[in-house]
Regions:
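C-terminal motif of bacterial Sec signal peptides marking the signal peptidase cleavage site
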Residues: 13-16
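Extracellular mucin-like PTS domains
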Residues: 27-64
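Domain-level recognition of soluble alpha/beta enzyme cores
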Residues: 60-151, 336-345
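Alpha/beta-hydrolase-fold serine-hydrolase catalytic core, especially in secreted/extracellular enzymes
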Residues: 67, 77, 88, 312-399
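Short substrate-entry loop that stabilizes the transition state in hydrolases
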Residues: 128-190, 279-283
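Alpha/beta-hydrolase active-site loop
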Residues: 163, 167, 194-227, 232, ...
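Gly/Ala-rich beta-loop-alpha elbow adjacent to hydrolase catalytic centers
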Residues: 234-238, 242
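Short beta-strand/loop motif that positions the catalytic acidic residue
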Residues: 272-274, 278
Length: 399
């Protein structure tokens, strides 16, 4: 039982840490202005010109000013609501632009709640965590007189639908409806109880499609969710879900976070995120996806790791790692859970900023307004260093 408890605790702090398939910033616009110019006539004079020789000065060399990026790492203009949808044997959370009550408080998520009740007593209290979702439970749905594009998020192996609230809520704040569902066949509860597997073939993709159906049927969210503009993203095994779901007609663009290539690569606009030191899904596996894409951007974060893209990474970083578990589960499993979440890894919040910036820019460019998204450029000097930033074709081709 000690081993099982340790494994459960490890999974809690490092959700999505492995898979077997790889699988208020504002747009800066110059204000309109008109500069008035005046011409003053000089008094008329008569002069006798002397012969002169004039040598023309060569024109000054032209200079090109690099385009200034628009940053999306800060929260967008919308407050965010959260609603939970019942999908039968599993649930999905929806983050959406909202109008909260003046005295409303954002929802705090207790990660201990994702475990079966009979196991919760065995989880050490100091290793559990609470996360501010920065979203308001059941807040009034904003009506922007048009529907918002939809984004699906898929969690990793041993994960749960709330594994990356820093990301899902952030995307919604920029005017998107974000839906994230539990994949119970490979989720945290199944890992904790030893019941992994089962479900239909491609069950995780079916989970996403079923969540879209439930979203469309929701009386308040359905009318503001534009299922003609749809993206999917996912971390680790969820990145594999994203790549496979991209083959579905409903999906227009997709994103992959610390994941490898699927057996069949779909040619739609894509973004690929990599942690430089990821030892769980090694970078070459992620490059295996990017190298096959016609229209894509790849972003490789210096000193980033596999779990740099999850809520739990901050807690592990603040603890200084999980060395207290080595005696129970061994250094290899501890290293797997710590991947990207202990120094000298990049601070988790900086990895969050990079992921949030490029994700929102990619979505705005493809679904709303390419001009408002700004140029797609390396933000190493503005957020945190990247070891690789490359574009192939036109990642904004869906616009």
């Amino acid at each position: 039982m000690r081993i099982r408890v340790a494994l459960i605790t490890l999974a809690l702090l490092a959700t999505g840490c492995g898979d077997d398939e790889g699988g208020d910033a504002a747009t800066n616009e110059a204000p309109d202005s008109t500069s008035a110019s005046t011409t003053t006539a000089a008094p008329a004079t008569t002069t006798t010109a002397l012969p002169t020789t004039t040598t023309e000065e060569p024109p000054p060399p032209s200079t090109t000013v690099a385009p200034q990026p628009v940053l999306f790492n800060e929260r967008g203009p919308w407050a965010v609501g959260i609603v939970t949808l019942d999908l039968g044997d599993r649930q999905a959370d929806v983050y959406y632009p909202a109008i909260p009550e003046p005295d409303a408080q954002t929802e705090i998520f207790d990660s201990l709640s994702v475990f079966p009740a009979e196991l919760q007593a065995f989880i050490p209290a100091e290793l559990t965590g609470e996360f501010d979702t920065t979203a308001y439970r059941d807040a009034l749905v904003a009506n922007d007189e048009q529907a918002f594009p939809v984004v699906a998020y898929s969690h990793g192996f041993g994960g749960f639908r709330q594994a990356a609230t820093f990301h899902t809520s952030h995307i919604a704040s920029w005017g998107f409806v974000v839906v994230t569902t539990d994949h119970i066949e490979r989720g945290i509860a199944a890992q904790a109880t030893g019941t992994l597997g089962g479900g239909a073939e491609n069950q995780d993709v079916l989970d996403v499609l079923n969540a879209f159906d439930a979203l469309e049927a929701h009386p308040e969210l359905g009318p503001v969710s534009d299922l003609d503009r749809v993206a999917i993203t996912g971390h680790s095994a969820g990145g594999g879900t994203s790549a496979r779901a991209a083959a579905e007609e409903v999906i227009d663009v997709y994103l992959s976070i610390a994941a490898g290539a699927s057996e069949r690569v779909t040619q739609k606009p894509a973004a690929v995120f990599i942690g430089e030191t990821d030892a769980v899904v090694k970078p070459e596996r992620s490059y295996g996806l990017f190298d096959q894409l016609d229209n894509a951007v790849v972003v490789n974060i210096a000193a980033g790791g596999h779990n740099s893209f999850t809520d739990s990474c901050v807690g592990i970083y603040e603890l200084g790692g999980l060395s207290v578990l080595e005696a129970l589960i061994g250094p290899e499993q501890v290293a797997r859970a710590e991947d990207g979440c202990v120094p000298p890894a990049v601070e988790p919040e900086l990895a969050y900023d990079v992921l949030n910036h490029y994700t929102v820019q990619f979505l705005i460019a493809n679904f709303i307004d390419p001009a408002a998204a700004g140029p797609l450029v390396d933000v190493s000097d503005l957020i945190t260093p990247l070891v690789d930033f490359r574009v192939t074709g036109n990642p904004f081709a869906a616009s």
